[in-house]
From Swiss-Prot:
It comes from Xenopus laevis (African clawed frog). GO terms for biological process: meiotic cell cycle; negative regulation of G2/M transition of mitotic cell cycle; negative regulation of G2/MI transition of meiotic cell cycle; regulation of mitotic nuclear division. It catalyses: L-seryl-[protein] + ATP = O-phospho-L-seryl-[protein] + ADP + H(+); L-threonyl-[protein] + ATP = O-phospho-L-threonyl-[protein] + ADP + H(+). It is a peripheral membrane protein. ATP binds at L109, G110, R111, G112, S113, F114, G115, E116, V117, K132. This is Membrane-associated tyrosine- and threonine-specific cdc2-inhibitory kinase. Negatively regulated by hyperphosphorylation during mitosis. The plk1/plk1 protein kinase may be required for mitotic phosphorylation. Inactivated during oocyte maturation by phosphorylation by RSK2 and Mos kinase.
């Protein structure tokens, strides 16, 4: 309804300081024209897609990518792609992935922002490897190409004794897998095991190994840009290897220095802040890593300490115990000016490095020789044990056959073992057996027969009637029922002696009474109990001693 106005024809809403909405003039109209389709500016924007889901285009038709297929595909920049990884164990008809069918996961070694590393055992050759799997699936073609660059960098490095060996890579279900050799641990873990600094000889060995690995990269115009103890791996033979080439840059490639990224700020060269990427940056990072492990020093991430190290000032309280030759090497590697900083070739030409390299070669030769000797010794021991078992197989089989044919014999001192008497009774309890005659329990026919015969030996004897009337120590518990079928089967299986005949079923049937619970258990009269020979208990032995 229309809003009433005043004498001037103005409504109260016109005098309010609040601006009147644009649609208020249309509110007084009873009818309005039909609105046509509004423009895109009046519609709500579409909701953003989930980051973990595949990007779906709302304009172009959804194209199925080859890498989005669930089937595994080999990734290599040397050979044609879109091939299934070569393995005899993989079956495409199964629902499991290539990783689960061909590898046995042992444990998780670590996790980073780009992937997680697992220690696995190959089911094809039985060797142990390290497999790095990407944390998140491919979000698109650009994200996939960015992650596949790490595979190309590993193939670009090639094989070298001081670089982590790359085995193969594949993609499956929009996830990237990289298989490399397995090492014993990283240099950071190795240095943390020591209470203080590493020994000088060990530091020289690490320096020689890493300089040779860095020379291999620089000869191929490759920059690592992330050298630190966490990215240096130690093999099981003690050789240090450079790894984690995710930030590596090719100087003569298409990337150039525009796509380069600096690594950890604790080991970063000062010229990287100005965007200058050169081989000298890796030399500075290697010097900072050696300073940390040699002096057991916590490197600063920033502040005055970070500036002092970049200005060539080495703290004397940490470097006073270092050898002079090694301190000279560190000073040359940590030169603030990258143009005057030492190169890898110049460092390898130093007399101290050459001397340490000769000792390193002798040490590695000794370790390899010792490893081969141990392997040959283990093979000989295994071969001798196999031949010994093969020759003694007929003898072991004959002894096993004789052991099965031999009858068990019981010791003569205990003709009534407890396990023999307890095994013939059922473990069920009878509610009617809890009566007044608990201590006066007649023996069962099966127990009577076992007392008379035991493995073919005659056990009939005489004893005092008053001693037999006393309850034994084992008869003070509530009697348990005997299964009729089980007792008949046991009774028929017992051996007989010439002097003692089998108890007839007629005699046992006469002593049973259907009105009592003892009749169902197969108990006999008490007169039979007095004529049997029972094992002596402590109470009987005490009475015999008092009578004498």
């Amino acid at each position: 309804m229309p809003v009433p106005g005043d004498d001037m024809g103005e409504t109260p809403l016109t005098r309010t300081p609040i601006p009147m909405p644009a649609y208020f003039s249309q509110a007084e109209q009873s009818f309005s024209l039909k609105k046509r389709g509004r423009s895109l500016c009046y519609t709500l924007p579409p909701r953003p897609p989930v980051k973990s889901a595949l990007p779906v285009s709302r304009i172009f038709p959804n194209k199925q990518r080859s890498w989005s297929q669930p089937r595994p595909q080999s990734v290599s920049f040397r050979s044609p792609q879109n091939k299934t990884p070569a393995s005899k164990l993989y079956d495409q008809s199964k629902g499991d992935t290539f990783f689960k069918q061909c590898f046995k996961s042992i444990c998780k070694l670590g996790r980073g922002s780009f992937g997680e590393v697992y220690k696995v055992q190959s089911l094809e050759d039985g060797c142990f490897y390290a497999v790095k799997r990407s944390v998140s699936p491919f979000r698109g073609e650009s994200d996939r190409q960015r992650k596949l660059q790490e595979v190309r960098k590993h193939e670009r490095v090639g094989e070298h004794p001081n670089c982590l060996r790359f085995v193969r890579a594949w993609e499956e279900k929009r996830m990237l897998y990289l298989q490399t050799e397995l090492c014993a641990g990283s240099l950071q873990q190795h240095s943390e095991e020591f209470a203080g600094s590493l020994p000088p000889r060990r530091v020289w060995n690490i320096t020689c190994d890493l300089l040779h690995g860095l020379k291999h990269l620089h000869d191929r115009n490759l920059l690592h840009l992330d050298i630190k103890p966490a990215n240096v791996f130690i093999s099981f033979s003690g050789v240090c290897k450079l790894g984690d080439f995710g930030l590596m840059v090719e100087l003569d490639g298409t990337e150039g220095s525009g796509e380069a990224q600096e690594g950890d700020p604790r080991y970063m060269a000062p010229e990287l802040l100005d965007g200058i990427f050169s081989k000298a940056a890796d030399v500075f990072s290697l010097g900072m890593s050696l300073l940390e492990v040699a002096c057991n020093m916590e490197l600063p991430k920033g502040g005055d300490g970070w500036q002092q190290l970049r200005q060539g000032h080495l703290p004397t309280e940490f470097t006073s115990d270092l050898p002079p030759d090694f301190l000279k090497v560190l000073s040359a590697m940590l030169e603030p000016d990258y143009r005057r900083r030492a190169t890898v070739d110049w460092l390898l030409s130093l007399p101290a490095i050459r001397n340490a390299e000769r000792w390193r070669m002798v040490t590695l030769a000794q370790e390899r020789t010792l490893g081969k000797i141990i392997a040959v010794y283990q093979f000989i021991v295994w071969l001798l044990s196999f031949v010994f078992q093969w020759l003694n197989r007929p003898v072991i089989g004959f002894l096993h056959y004789c052991g099965l044919r031999a009858l068990p014999r019981s010791p003569p001192c205990s003709p009534f073992p407890n396990h023999l008497g307890e095994s013939s009774f059922s473990s069920d309890w009878d509610d009617e057996s809890l009566g007044d005659d608990v201590f006066e329990v007649p023996p069962s026919p099966l127990a009577t027969h076992r007392n008379l015969t035991y493995h073919g030996q005659e056990l009939i004897g005489r004893h005092s009637p008053d001693l037999l009337s006393r309850p034994s120590l084992g008869s003070t518990s509530t009697p348990r029922n005997l299964s009729p079928e089980f007792s008949m089967r046991k009774r028929s299986a017992l051996p007989l002696t010439p002097n003692v005949s089998r108890i007839s079923q007629d005699s046992t049937g006469k002593s049973r009474s259907p009105s009592t619970s003892h009749s169902s258990s197969g108990f006999v009269d008490a007169e039979v109990q007095r004529t049997l020979f029972l094992p002596r208990n402590l109470l009987g032995m005490f009475d015999d001693a008092t009578e004498q």
